[in-house]
Each structure stands twice: as C-alpha cells, then as structure tokens.
C-alpha cells in the first residue's frame, strides 16, 4: 500500500509543523472478498489496520461497502479524515479529498443515488449498527457509503483519535487482504507515515 515510515527528525519543519504529505496516523482497510449485499451483518468483510503515532499497528473488524447497491462505493484512493460528529450525534472520522472543505470525495463514476453528482458527500468512518448490523433498517441504511467499524470495539477505535488528528485513509478494492508495506523499513521507534501513491499496488 506504499506506507513508508519516516524518521521523526525528518518529519517536521523548523516551526515544529508536520511537513506536507506526512501523517502521524493512517488507516488501511483490507478487502477479503467476503462482502455479501444480501447479508445483514458484514462486519469482518474488511479489516482496518490503524497505524498509531507510537509506531504500533492495531486492527479492527470493519466493512467498507454501503448497505445497498444504490449507494456509492468509495474508490481505492488516498483520502484524508478528520475528527468530527457523525450526523451530529457522536464523534467519528469524517472523510474527504485533500483540500476539500465540504466533506466530498470524488468518485470514478456518477453517484448512483445522485446521478448528477460524481462525488460522495458526508462519508464517515463510524460504528456499525446494533449487533453489528450493516444493512438497511427502518431508519435507512447503516452505511450510505461510509466505512463501518465493529460496534463492540468502537470506543477503542475512536479513542486513538482526537480533534487534532489528521488521518490518511485508503481502502483496498482489489482483494488485498492486508497491507503490503513493500517499501516499509519498519522500526518501532519511527512514528510518521508517508504515502507514496498507496493505491498503486506493486
């Protein structure tokens, strides 16, 4: 996936600001090929590999497909996520393209729900429904294009982030079951994640 760990002394400018293109946290979502649109419970069809600031990696069961076929699928690309409210209710990670202030992610096709748009807006990383339900319920879809995390470990997941967090996110759409890390020289004392076209898998 192109994750590369950069020594901390090479990661900040003279003002102590993280250099452009570098992230202290990142998430890679796998694709294990088990998602079934007819299944109401698809948590575990993806794994979220969370790269932490301390150099450790933790994993969470996840789902990166929407609850119904008439909602868009975020393509395999690098996006950014920031800490914010999901539907005004609880804190989650709000995804968007780089430099976008409207929580939009450009798609590679027309949005099936809104055919006049080639983007998805308001896609978050949030917890799954009750008992890890991932389908369409009485109040609508659990995911209208969002990424879902195991509800039983949600507090642990979101606890790794805060209002200052700026997180790099990429989801596999090519059946990649775990991060390749082919250009990674991983050392536990190296804390910064830099991406080099992570969606181009060698």
Language-model-detected regions and their locations in the chain:
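Cell wall/extracellular polymer interaction/catalysis modules
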Residues: 1-140, 154-202
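Short Cys/His-based metal-binding microdomains
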Residues: 149-150
């Amino acid at each position: 996936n192109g994750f590369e760990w950069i020594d901390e002394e090479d990661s900040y400018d003279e003002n102590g600001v993280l250099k452009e293109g570098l992230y202290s946290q990142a998430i890679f979502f796998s694709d294990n090929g088990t998602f079934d649109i007819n299944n109401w419970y698809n948590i575990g069809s993806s794994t979220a590999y969370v790269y932490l600031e301390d150099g450790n990696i933790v994993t969470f069961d996840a789902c990166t497909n929407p609850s119904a076929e008439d909602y868009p699928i975020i393509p395999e690309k690098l996006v950014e996520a920031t800490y914010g409210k999901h539907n005004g209710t609880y804190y989650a990670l709000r995804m968007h393209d780089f430099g976008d202030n409207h929580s939009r992610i450009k798609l590679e096709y027309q949005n099936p729900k809104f055919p006049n748009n080639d983007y998805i807006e308001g896609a978050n990383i949030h917890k799954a429904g009750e008992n890890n339900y991932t389908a369409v319920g009485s109040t609508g879809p659990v995911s209208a294009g969002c990424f879902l995390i195991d509800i039983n470990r949600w507090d642990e997941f979101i606890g790794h982030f805060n209002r200052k967090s700026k997180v790099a996110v990429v989801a596999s759409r090519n059946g990649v079951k775990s991060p390749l890390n082919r250009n990674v020289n991983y050392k536990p004392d190296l804390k910064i994640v830099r991406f080099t076209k992570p969606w181009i898998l060698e």
